[in-house]
Amino acid sequence: MLPGWHSIASLVKRIDIPIVASTTPAEIAEMQQDAWPEAGKYGLGWVYFSVILLAISTIIRFYHLWGDQIRIALHKEDMAGTSPYVTSPQEEYELPSAATDSSTTHFFPARGPLPSTNTTKQQSSISTIAPLNNTIAFVRWIFYRPIPVLRIGKLRIGFPSLGASSIILAALIFVTLYSFVPQPLYYSSISIGSPPLAIRAGMIAVAMIPWIIALSTRANFVSILTGISHERLNVLHRWAGYLCLFLSLIHMVPFYVTPIWESTNFMYYQQYFPRNIYIYGTGWAALVPLIVLCLHSLPILRAWMYELFKLVHLPLSIIFLAMIFWHSKNFLASWDYLWATVAIWMLSYAVRLFYVNWSNPLRLSFLIGEECAVTILPQNAIKVTVATQMKWKPGQFVYLRMPGISLFERHPFTISSLCSGDFPSEYGENYRDLALVFRPFGGFTRNVFLKTFEYGPYKTWTAFLEGPYGGMKRDMAAFDDVVFFAGGSGITATASHLLNLIKKMRDRKAVTRSVRVVWAFRSPETIDWFREELRICRDFAPPNTVHCHFFLTGLEPHGQDQLAQNQFYQEMLRDKMYNTLEGMDKRNSAYIREEAAGDPEIEKELRRENEDAITALPLAHTLPHINTSRHYTSPMDNNYQHAPYPAPHVSPADTPFNFGFPPSSTVFPKLTTRVGTVPLQRNGWRIDYARPNIPQVLKDYSRTFGRRTCVFVCGPPSMRVEVSKAVAQLQQVVMTDSSKDEIFLHAENYNV
């Protein structure tokens, strides 16, 4: 055997130092402290930590899923014994003399006993356990609250949600303690073995890599088990990468504290390795890509050079993984974690083939994509309509690539249309119109706007879709009350949920009895984006179930001279919307013909039922009403008085449905409807001219909440923060009121 062979072998292995005849008893005793063969347990420690978190999240997900399905099933069972013509989940108060064959509820029924006042619905036994519901409410009271933004001069630093931050903090504490608490941190000499601290940190870092990749992929097992979509897991992906860098630095530093070149075995190291390679070259080869990956994923840098980030992130990740293979040399079964990483990565890409619209050979879009039309909406918004055989659920999003706009760019957009047989595409019964609505800001969206402006709305484009991804992990139909908050283009994530919920309510498949929509936008033209969807909600929702509250925030006074003029404009615009909605309470004739499907007898019956509704007497002229609602603080001076104007001579049948917004700057006087009897409770549409006072709005709504309420918000960060704080505060109602079981919050990402 060559001289010094044992020393060279020990340096090659770097850490597994064999016991030979020359090893002293003191060195043997020191080597047994946190021995090298047992160091693999530190990688398993991180695996156990991650699996426990995954198991808890999965159990919570399936607990809620089970409870939601049981409540919906019990509701269907209750509805099976009632008349299919009763469509309103709330009472409709009518006078006894106004009864018709279409009436549903009376103060005094014509025959039989008085109706029972006991309307308690069946509930899932496990979902009504008060201590469990109170515990969940207490956890939400804590974790629904957002972390305040840190301001350092002009720099604003945002943090993840409190729940995500708690997981990140727990992981940081775990890996730090697991690295530094076991002893020893160093050996007396690196000739005995590599520093135990470095080995512990290195094994934990390697064990984290499969989880980092799993949290980054679009189709991953974490989303399948927990119901949390990949875009929400991305924050954990980034912070897990930062923790991996933190552990890699801990792994590196001890090798410089006890450097190999101070050992007597350094000369043998030089004999075994080429002299032109740095001693720790393989470690630096893996560390540098990791540093770059973490730095350019910082929010401030990623937003500044997003296109570059997308271009280099994947290649850098592949280089990093290859360098880790080279550096670790399969010590302590480290390659098991790395091969698991490769398997997760490849499996994700294989599964993604089922998410693209051009990979199915049974579809006409196979390898060529699908046609789409692009329309410019008011306020320069863009609507892309793709006729596709793809199926999706409300609130999901897709990645859109249009080679005619940009060959390789792919961007996520929320689907604003409903995938239902009630809304077939003109391409055929097997197709549905997938609608994407977004504002042009820069890059891809700006190019879409410019190309559409250049070629016009009649040009068709090729679209390649990937998805759908995301969506809610809870079923809205299992909640008694649903409240939607939307800010500006955030209505895109709300529209499909609203249509789907109304459809289920009409089909008697939803527990929901009340739906409230609060939409804040700057310009009246914004409502044109979803004019047809709102018309459907008003015409087809069960009576007295959908209430829409619009907040027009774009009317800001610019001086004292405009104060009175803006106030007058507000009052007139509000009144016109009221009158439009009141004057169109009947079912639209076009929908009657569509529902009759060409059968004259059914159409005749539907029109007769429509005429049975209580109608209003002619309109009267009164002074404009000044709104004094406490839902907002108006910046206008309410002391300004206006004089009545003559009524315009416009036929209601010739007036297009415009939700109260005039097509020009002409304003109209208030027209108040007088009725000859007590009407049904169908007035649920309202508009105000200020920013919504969200805490007060939710507080007022909470007085009529049922046992379970869902609050959905999609809007700018300020709106999400206000809604989160308000819902967190309302958890006290659940903990103190036995008639309330749950107030659930779902906050949608405004940028997707």
UniProtKB/Swiss-Prot annotation:
Belongs to the ferric reductase (FRE) family. The keyword Lipid biosynthesis does not apply. This is Probable cell surface ferric reductase kap2. Heme 1 binds at residues 237, 313. The chain crosses the membrane at residues 40-60, 157-177, 195-215, 241-261, 281-301, 306-326, 331-351, 482-502. The lineage of its organism: Eukaryota, Fungi, Dikarya, Ascomycota, Pezizomycotina. It comes from the Eukaryota. Heme 2 binds at residues 251, 327. One of its GO terms (biological process) is intracellular iron ion homeostasis. Keywords: Cell membrane, Electron transport, Glycoprotein, Ion transport, Iron, Membrane, Metal-binding, NADP, Oxidoreductase, Transmembrane, Transmembrane helix, Transport. Glycans are attached at residues 118, 133, 357, 627.
